[in-house]
Amino acid sequence: RVMNINLKGPLFLSQIAARQMLRQAVRPDGRRGTIISISSISADTVSLNRAEYCLSKAGISMMTQILALRLAQDAIPVFEVRPGIIKTDMTARVQDTYDRMIEQGVFPMRRWGQPDDVAAAVALLASGTLTYATGECLHVDGGFHIRRL
């Protein structure tokens, strides 16, 4: 069920969107459209009790790269937004755990991410500002992805 919702659904929707975009003329901004997928820090952060979720999000990351490579010559950039700990209903039941992690500095920006943070990342990628980019992953995780010792 998790794989169907989190991986197959976005893959099939992206394929439908790409087919539609391919039928369109290239716009003045040089694109036919943009495909943006939402993954999670779980794409590359192991959580044994959420293995299927992690696999599905890692799959989204690979899907983004495959589609980016396939669609680059057709003027359709493809991007991934990878949120960290975002304050939503999904994270409410583990709020105390994440509050402690934030306090301990696991997330360098030391705050919860907000849905508006993710929306701003999507808006940036959809804006057409990044005219020579595709296949990129935009981390919206308060610096969590930065490797540290």
Residue ranges: model-predicted function:
Residues 45, 123, 134-149:
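Short C-terminal tail/terminal secondary-structure segment
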